[in-house]
């Protein structure tokens, strides 16, 4: 037989004849069970390296809370932080409503922070620090944010 008589097929139809079974991905449990019943080779592999997934530390914290049997109280804001917010706000002659609009929050959020009822939020504390010019995190709470250099 010469080279002129054979036909070379490129593309989708190239498997016709001796192509063998194509590898399938079973998406459901039913498909997986059907493959096992028919005697096909079944391999399960975990997908790694998905790009758009990010671990959520909040979920990890909730898992730890589920593992603990006793009731764990939520973290509340320290009272001296609330007093520092109140003093700095009054020095700048701002009401709670004025301060809230300045940092794009609701007035009751400012009220909760000043009363020490709020759960600390680092982003919101940062906004308050910049608006009032007073440190509210770490040590030296209540001191000016940008102290004058000696």
From Swiss-Prot:
Taxonomy, superkingdom: Eukaryota
Domain HTH cro/C1-type residue range list: 85-139
Keywords attached to this entry: Activator, DNA-binding, Transcription, Transcription regulation
Region (Disordered): 32-59
GO process terms (BP): GCN2-mediated signaling; maintenance of translational fidelity; rescue of stalled ribosome
Keyword match Transmembrane: no
Single GO MF annotation: DNA binding
Keyword DNA-binding: yes
DNA-binding region per UniProt: 96-115
Protein name (database record): Multiprotein-bridging factor 1
Species: Debaryomyces hansenii (strain ATCC 36239 / CBS 767 / BCRC 21394 / JCM 1990 / NBRC 0083 / IGC 2968) (Yeast)
GN (gene name): MBF1
